[in-house]
Regions:
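Glycine-enriched alpha-helix->loop->beta-strand junction motifs that scaffold or abut catalytic
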Residues: 153-155, 183-184, 245-248
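Residue-level marker for buried hydrophobic side chains located in beta-strands
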Residues: 133-134, 187
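Histidine-centered divalent metal-coordination motifs
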Residues: 73, 190, 194
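N-terminal export signals
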Residues: 5-21
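Acidic (Asp/Glu)-rich catalytic clusters
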Residues: 147-152, 172-188
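Short beta-strand and adjacent tight-turn residues that come in two discontinuous sequence segments
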Residues: 160, 190, 250-252
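A short, conserved beta-to-alpha structural element at the edge of catalytic cores
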Residues: 155-174
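C-terminal active-site subregion of NodB/CE4 polysaccharide deacetylases
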Residues: 20-22, 29-133, 140-142, 178, ...
């Protein structure tokens, strides 16, 4: 794939080693007389240790950042009151299904967020034409519309809910997050209440960055290591707080990745519902 800068509109505001040794062994030979047993054969192979993978340099991570990442928001039909901008990021269910079919017909294989980050950081293998599907904000339609279609296609995806809205009407519940997680989907954080991270001060860092990770970890029973920035906006100060909070990687939208910390500024594009199949495939090839 060839890289080029792709500027995407920001998201709509929402109301969230192990070591393996080859041990020496001794095999005894039984005797029926008083003569001493023959010497026991002993393995001469030295113990082996499986070293943990070595993280790539920032330059290596940037060079691997050619996997397309798509960002979706609400999955529902448009309404008369929807603004022109809202219509660019609200995907009708029929269009969503057509987009998934295009991805399949194009030979792409959706991967998990963890698999993509492993590839970027360590160079682990991915399918021939990988793509990452992400869903921001925590809308209930991610479960009611998105999950069944993803399951029907056999696709994996990553969901980034804001934690303030969990359990509220029309938003994802904790039980639904657990079900998505058990199905092999990735769950990441999207702040507490969708504040821009480039405007956070003081205790807001704890509320918006640290606490959502802790809550999602508690809900799922395992660490949550990924996050997505509301509106796709980030700052140098935010990168330090994201690292300190324990996140492994973070996703923005269309800006260039930070050359020093590319894992914390992974790019995504938002496919508008007006894109037909060829346009979607062309952008998967050209935008990364």
């Amino acid at each position: 794939m060839r890289r080029r800068q792709f500027l995407a509109a920001a998201a709509a505001a929402a109301l969230a080693g192990c070591s393996r040794g080859t041990a020496s062994f001794t095999r005894s030979v039984g005797t029926t007389s008083g003569s001493p047993p023959p010497p026991s054969p002993t393995s001469s192979a030295p113990p082996t240790t499986s070293a943990p993978p070595t993280p790539g340099t920032a330059q290596e991570i940037l060079a691997r950042s050619t996997v397309p990442v798509l960002c979706f928001h609400q999955l529902r039909d448009h309404r008369p009151e929807d603004s022109d901008y809202a219509r660019t990021i609200i995907t009708p269910p029929s269009v969503f299904t057509a987009q998934l079919q295009t991805i399949r017909d194009g030979g792409y294989t959706p991967v998990t967020g963890e698999a993509l980050v492993d590839h970027l950081e360590f160079g682990t293998a991915l399918p021939a034409k990988p793509v990452l599907l992400t869903f921001d904000d925590g809308w209930g339609t991610h479960y009611s519309v998105g999950f069944p279609e993803l399951t029907r296609f056999g696709f994996k995806a990553t969901f980034f809910p804001q934690t303030m809205v969990l359990g509220a009407q029309n938003w994802l519940s904790e039980d639904q997050l657990r079900e998505l997680d058990r199905a092999g989907m990735t769950i990441g954080a999207h702040t507490f209440d969708h504040k821009r991270v480039d405007r956070l001060v003081g205790d807001q860092w704890r509320v918006e960055i640290d606490e959502p990770r802790a809550r999602l970890t508690g809900i799922l029973g395992h660490p949550v290591d990924l996050m997505a920035y509301p509106y796709g906006v980030w700052s140098q100060e935010a990168l330090g707080h994201v690292t300190a909070a324990g996140y492994r990687a973070a996703f923005q939208l269309g800006d260039a990745q930070d050359p020093a910390q590319p894992l914390l500024t992974i790019r995504r594009i938002m496919p508008p519902p007006t894109w037909d199949g060829p346009t979607l495939l062309a952008n998967l090839e050209s935008a990364f």
